[in-house]
């Protein structure tokens, strides 16, 4: 993709159609569900104790691949700071069944099971995850597929990018705020090539992530 986002790259496949009629590419992308599906999920959230009048974070504290998960204890520290600084925010953990669920519940335990975290709220299908996105104020955590879905529903995101993942490719820029924190922000290519992935991840400190998150949330308010 070079310096282009994956969205721009994929839209480029339509360029041969320019011979028929000029194509005006757009940067916006959306996922649509029915109003009934959206209302149904909103009701479910309320039944789980979520106050829809207050901000909600969807936190991606884990991932399918261990190589795409930032240090767990650092994540716990950042979320603890967030809860102290923004006590009115509600937090939902994004996780799949199996190891991801185990990881998410371990993070929940390490946090001390705060009332701000609604650990049992789940989207049980891709369409429900889209529905969830329309109620989220912010997506935060490890970069991954769920972030793209949230972006398509208009949910702003701040993510930690795994080493080797080009954030300009995976964080398309449009009207929805989307920012990433990556090792490439902190060291040049000559330095990074001498480091393995865990060493590159270690460049991303908890203090840096917290300052970025705090500033991002303050801009949203």
For the regions a language model picked out, list residue spans one by one.
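Catalytic machinery of carbohydrate-active enzymes
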Residues: 1-221
């Amino acid at each position: 993709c070079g310096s282009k986002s994956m969205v721009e790259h994929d839209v480029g496949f339509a360029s041969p159609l320019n011979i028929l009629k000029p194509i005006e590419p757009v940067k916006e992308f959306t996922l649509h569900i029915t109003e009934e599906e959206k209302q149904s999920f909103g009701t479910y959230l309320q039944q789980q104790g979520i106050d829809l009048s207050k901000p909600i974070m969807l936190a991606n504290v884990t991932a399918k691949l261990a190589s795409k998960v930032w240090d767990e204890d650092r994540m716990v520290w950042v979320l603890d700071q967030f809860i102290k600084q923004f006590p009115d925010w509600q937090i939902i953990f994004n996780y799949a069944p199996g190891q991801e669920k185990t990881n998410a519940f371990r993070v929940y335990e390490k946090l001390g099971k705060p009332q701000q975290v609604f650990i049992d709220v789940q989207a049980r299908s891709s369409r429900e995850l889209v529905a969830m996105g329309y109620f989220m104020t912010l997506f935060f955590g490890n970069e991954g597929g769920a972030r793209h879905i949230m972006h398509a529903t208009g949910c702003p995101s701040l993510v930690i990018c795994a080493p080797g993942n080009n954030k300009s490719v995976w964080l398309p820029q449009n009207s929805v705020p989307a920012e990433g924190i990556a090792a490439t922000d902190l060291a040049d290519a000559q330095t990074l090539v001498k480091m393995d992935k865990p060493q590159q991840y270690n460049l991303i400190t908890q203090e840096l992530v917290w300052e970025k998150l705090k500033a991002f949330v303050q801009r949203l308010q």
